[in-house]
Design a protein with these regions (language model features):
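Soluble catalytic domains of enzymes that build or remodel membrane lipids, polysaccharides, and related
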Residues: 172, 178-192, 203-383
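N-terminal, active-site-proximal structural segment of metallo-dependent hydrolase catalytic domains
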Residues: 2-32, 39, 58, 63, ...
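Short Gly/Ser/Thr- and charged-rich N-terminal loops/segments
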Residues: 42
Length: 383
């Protein structure tokens, strides 16, 4: 054992082992902290650079000091580019669907007919796409959104102008009066106030037909009712007959003989209703009725024809093409606006119309609401 004053034996490598008050770094005395063994380093216990004292990386960085995946400026730019391309692609597809609406398949749920019925409303997508393009600050998306806008204006821009003009020598009105109408007398007064030469009424019951006959007798001394449809006229009627378009009578024809002009063949029609259900847009009976009506029109020899009624479909619906391809819409040629007629509380589609052949529409419009769920439609024509 060494005494306190003796030196330690040399180490095997020749380096003396410091002890007590020997040479070299002195041993800590009492509570004095040991000195760092590297000159200029951080104080003892300081965390490495990039690590917080608690051992957690600062917000927004990884332990290595970089941004988390997907939050870097490069990642955000990449996602924005993808969003812009998706938006531009959606706009182009939307424009193509609008432009090629007649080519959308009608198999299964009759998607094509439903799309064509609601076609005017497709323009509502354009402002939404423009807002998204502005949020993304994308010139590509903004330019792409112009495509559906141009297509919609091409299809319906003319309807936004007032094409009504003066002239005309025959005014006609058509109205689905609604079998459940609680005020047929009030409805008759609204119709009489329009001052038309000819009225065509659809969805008549035996009881309501009697009310209309009574209320309209003073202004319209000539009338005929067959099944659920009827024609009231200021001028004599001739050649009155039913038109068989369905198993039950929902169409008729009469010749209106006005003294100041040539006779006109007038049809009052009510095609079968359509249904939107889990089975899709069911239109079979209506389509059959349209084909039967088209056959009757093919055999019609009168040079001047007016078809008034509830077609339960829009003029552009391909299923009505057998009829509409032979006639012209007074609303499309001489109306103001889109002329929606149903439902009366918030008209969203035009399923009631005035179609003509051999006559010139001068003006077309809708009348004020009655007790029916349809709005009446009117047109002034030149023979």
């Amino acid at each position: 054992m060494l005494s306190p004053t003796e030196s330690a034996a040399p180490a095997t490598d020749g380096t003396p082992a410091p002890v007590g008050g020997g040479r070299g770094t002195p041993a800590p005395v009492g509570n004095e902290p040991a000195a760092s063994d590297s000159t200029g380093s951080d104080p003892a216990g300081a965390p490495p650079a990039g690590i917080s004292p608690a051992g957690i990386s600062p917000p927004g960085t990884s332990p290595t000091g970089t941004s988390p995946p997907g939050t870097s400026p490069t990642g955000r730019a990449a996602r924005r580019r993808v969003a812009c391309r998706v938006l531009a692609g959606a706009a182009v597809v939307w424009a193509a669907a609008m432009a090629l609406h007649a080519s959308i398949p009608n198999a299964g749920v009759n998607a094509g007919s439903l799309f064509q019925t609601l076609l005017p409303w497709t323009g509502l997508g354009v402002p939404s796409l423009l807002v998204l393009a502005a949020v993304l600050r994308s010139r590509l998306a903004a330019v792409a959104v112009l495509a559906p806008a141009v297509v919609w204006v091409t299809l319906f821009g003319g309807a936004l102008t007032d094409k009504r003009a003066g002239g005309g020598d025959l005014t006609v009105v058509s109205h689905n009066v609604d079998e459940g109408n609680a005020d047929p007398a009030g409805t008759a007064r609204v119709l009489a106030a329009a001052g038309a030469d000819v009225l065509a009424l659809e969805e008549l019951s035996d009881a309501s037909a009697a009310v209309y006959s009574r209320e309209l007798a003073a202004a319209y001394p000539h009338h005929a009712v067959i099944g659920g449809v009827g024609i009231w006229s200021r001028h004599p009627l001739a050649d009155v007959k039913a038109v068989p378009i369905m198993p039950w009578t929902r169409a008729m024809r009469a010749t209106v003989r006005a003294p100041e002009g040539p006779p006109v063949a007038v049809y009052a029609v009510h095609l079968a209703s359509v249904r939107v259900s889990t089975a899709g847009f069911t239109t079979g009976r209506r389509n059959d009725a349209a084909r039967e009506l088209a056959a009757a029109l093919r055999s019609e020899t009168a040079p001047r024809v007016v078809v008034l009624g509830d077609f339960n479909g829009a003029y552009r619906d391909r299923a009505l093409a057998p009829v509409t391809s032979r006639l012209r819409s007074a609303q499309a040629e001489a109306g103001a606006g889109l002329g929606f007629t149903w439902p009366a509380a918030f008209p969203a589609v035009r399923i009631d119309d005035v179609l003509v052949r051999g006559m010139t529409p001068r003006a077309a419009w809708t009348l004020p609401a009655t007790g029916s769920d349809h709005l009446p439609v009117a047109a002034r024509l030149s023979r």
